[in-house]
Amino acid sequence: MTTSTDQPDVTAVSSYFETLQATICDALAEVDGQPFSTEEVPGPNGGHARPRVHSGGVVFEKGAVQFTHSVGSALPAAASERNPELAGQGFEACAISMIMHPRNPYVPVFHANLRFFIVGSTTWYFGGGFDLTPCYPFDEDVLHWHQTARDACAPFGEDVYPRLKADCDAYFYLPHREETRGVGGLFFDDWTEGGFTQSFAMCRSIGDHILPAYLPILGRRIAHVWGEREEAFLLYRRGRYAEFNLAIDRGTRYGLQSGRRIESVLASLPPRVNWHYNWQPEPGSPEEYLTEHYLKPQDWLSLLGAGKPPAQSKTSE
């Protein structure tokens, strides 16, 4: 957080997020052939939301790309737990959040969000990132995802990608399962480095790299043949997604605590999910390979860039 004289401009941030929402919805709708719905939902104190939801498409079974601009008299607990000195203060926030659940199990789920808070009169910070959750991972896809993530961070220092990558691994982790949600990406919070202008530039760079990170992967996997076995595994892995969003995610808790429209808060949940008691993958199967080799933090750029396979998890060795 900062109280820098480099004055924050919530209007500029809000405008960028709204433009990014339109760009991403248009690109994904072009791939699927079905448009996103559009709503304008007024909020208290002059705030508003624009949820755009995709449902029942050919490529995507469900998805949402949502913009919100909130104004409140007291910062919700989920937004101040890392900075308790801000609890109870008035705030203004804008955010874009997206999640796409594909039908094809070989197409990874992707999630991204960017947010900006002003608390009181001078304290502000950015947050967000993007992450990838494959059921049947391909090394070239994981490598491309992290190379693009690194490219997004490169103008802001060589240390930025490793830091945001490590924070992503730590955040998108299910401790009750002892596994990561997917293969990671970028995550940052309370970001003010370099003042508002540079922090906003980094936020825009990450936002501008979302489609270049995901569309090539989508294009490679969209026509991959799949059957009942792969679909069953997709529904099983979606359960992990639901567990994280409902039990762990700070964004979900913030949405519930801030009084946001419940349909928008829970729009990220997958449309169909299965849980199986004590399910175990077949030894030697692709399903076991995901569990044993991918659901742990790894240095993907060094590992896959050198042509090496991902390491087996320590708990299964």
Question: Can you say where each PLM-predicted feature lies in the sequence?
Answer:
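Hydrophobic, aromatic-enriched interface-forming segments
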Residues: 150, 154-200
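Internal mixed beta-strand/loop scaffold within catalytic domains of large alpha/beta enzymes
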Residues: 51-128
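Compact, glycine/acidic-enriched structural inserts
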Residues: 120-165
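TerminUS-proximal long segments
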Residues: 2-4, 259-317
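Gly/Pro-rich turn-and-neighbor structural signature
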Residues: 5-83, 191, 195-227, 231-241
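Short conserved micro-motifs at the rims of enzyme active sites and ligand-binding pockets
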Residues: 78-80, 197-198, 253-259, 277
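Glycine-rich, often proline-containing surface loops adjacent to acidic residues and nearby aromatics
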Residues: 63-64, 92-95, 124-133, 179-197, ...
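An amphipathic alpha-helical core segment
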Residues: 165, 169-187, 219-264
